[in-house]
């Protein structure tokens, strides 16, 4: 089974392998997906820069891909990783650190 990229970018929810904690949400195009499969590190597509980026390439806070899951419509991906350092560019463990309720 493969993701359906016919409508463009797919959301990729990144979770920590041991805790299943949600670390971040990013987007993948087909090239980012293929690079992720090949390198076992996360690659995403930046909508603002309109280019690929490798998580942790500059910070060293890389994500080692353990498994990938595809949803029932083949248009969303869950990426299970072993995170090195914080996932968020702010230095927080997860990008979801602002509690609303």
From Swiss-Prot:
Enzyme class (EC, first level): hydrolase
GO CC, one annotated term: cytoplasm
Cofactor note: Binds 1 Mg(2+) ion per subunit.
Keywords, alphabetical: Amino-acid biosynthesis, Cytoplasm, Histidine biosynthesis, Hydrolase, Magnesium, Metal-binding, Zinc
Pathway annotation from the record: Amino-acid biosynthesis; L-histidine biosynthesis; L-histidine from 5-phospho-alpha-D-ribose 1-diphosphate: step 3/9
Entry binding sites for Mg(2+): 71, 73, 75
Statement: the UniProt record of this protein carries the keyword Kinase: no
InterPro entries documented for this protein: PRA-CH (IPR026660), PRib_AMP_CycHydrolase_dom (IPR002496), PRib_AMP_CycHydrolase_sf (IPR038019)
Assigned EC number: 3.5.4.19
Cofactor(s) named in the record: Mg(2+); Zn(2+)
Chain sites annotated for binding Zn(2+): 72, 88, 95
One Pfam family hit: PRA-CH
GO biological process, one term: L-histidine biosynthetic process
Location in the cell: Cytoplasm
Catalysed reactions, semicolon-separated: 1-(5-phospho-beta-D-ribosyl)-5'-AMP + H2O = 1-(5-phospho-beta-D-ribosyl)-5-[(5-phospho-beta-D-ribosylamino)methylideneamino]imidazole-4-carboxamide
UniProt-listed Gene3D superfamilies: Phosphoribosyl-AMP cyclohydrolase (3.10.20.810)
GO molecular function: magnesium ion binding; phosphoribosyl-AMP cyclohydrolase activity; zinc ion binding
Oligomer status and interactors: Homodimer.
Function: Catalyzes the hydrolysis of the adenine ring of phosphoribosyl-AMP.
Family: Belongs to the PRA-CH family.
Name the record gives this protein: Phosphoribosyl-AMP cyclohydrolase
Organism: Bacillus thuringiensis (strain Al Hakam)
Lineage of the species this protein comes from: Bacteria, Bacillati, Bacillota, Bacilli, Bacillales
Name of the gene: hisI
């Amino acid at each position: 089974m493969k993701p359906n990229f016919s409508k463009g970018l797919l959301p990729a929810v990144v979770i920590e392998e041991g805790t299943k904690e949600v670390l971040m949400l990013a987007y993948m195009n087909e090239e980012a997906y293929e690079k992720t499969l090949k390198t076992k590190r996360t690659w995403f597509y930046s909508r603002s820069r309109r280019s690929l980026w490798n998580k942790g390439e500059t910070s060293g806070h890389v994500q080692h891909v353990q498994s990938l899951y595809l949803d029932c419509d083949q248009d969303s991906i869950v990426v299970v990783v072993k995170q090195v350092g914080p996932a968020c560019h702010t230095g927080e463990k997860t990008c979801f650190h602002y509690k609303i309720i």
